[in-house]
């Protein structure tokens, strides 16, 4: 699988990257909230979704050690918005809904000699009443409404 990668399992589209884009967005954004912003990390994820790019910072910051080869910049774009977007970061672990996607930062699986955290994702089947009432033109399959994400410690 490439990095970043977009793939589908049973009609659910996943997007994932190993690059810590959330911390880079956090350190390079120009935004000041009047009060403490409890949804700051989800707001950063929203930038990824709005720009439809796994790396929405161009050009990369001068102090960035991200291994970005600009010849492959097109591969950072996603044509279909992922239902579940996994953006691992050293920042606090989080999970939340951004538009019609679920954004997850499972943090790091290993932290030095101690265990870290991971995301346990459960997606329930689409209820029969939603299947029967759906039209051919309807493309929404309600993934955020039928998904539970638990961030667990090892």
Where are these regions (language model features)?
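Extended recognition/assembly regions associated with phosphoester-bond processing machinery
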Residues: 1-154
């Amino acid at each position: 699988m490439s990095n970043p990668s977009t793939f589908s399992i049973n009609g659910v589209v996943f997007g994932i990257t190993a690059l810590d884009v959330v911390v880079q967005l956090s350190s390079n954004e120009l935004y000041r909230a009047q009060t403490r912003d409890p949804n700051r990390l989800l707001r950063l994820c929203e930038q990824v979704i709005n720009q439809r790019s796994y790396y929405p910072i161009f050009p990369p910051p001068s102090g960035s050690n991200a291994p970005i080869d600009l010849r492959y910049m097109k591969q950072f774009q996603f044509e279909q918005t992922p239902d579940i977007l996994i953006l691992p970061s050293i920042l606090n672990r989080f999970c939340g809904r951004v538009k019609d996607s679920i954004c997850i930062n499972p943090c790091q699986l290993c932290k030095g000699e101690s265990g870290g955290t991971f995301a346990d994702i459960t997606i329930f089947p689409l209820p029969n009443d939603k299947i029967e009432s759906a039209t051919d033109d309807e493309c929404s399959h309600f993934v955020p409404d039928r998904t539970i994400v638990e961030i667990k410690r090892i």
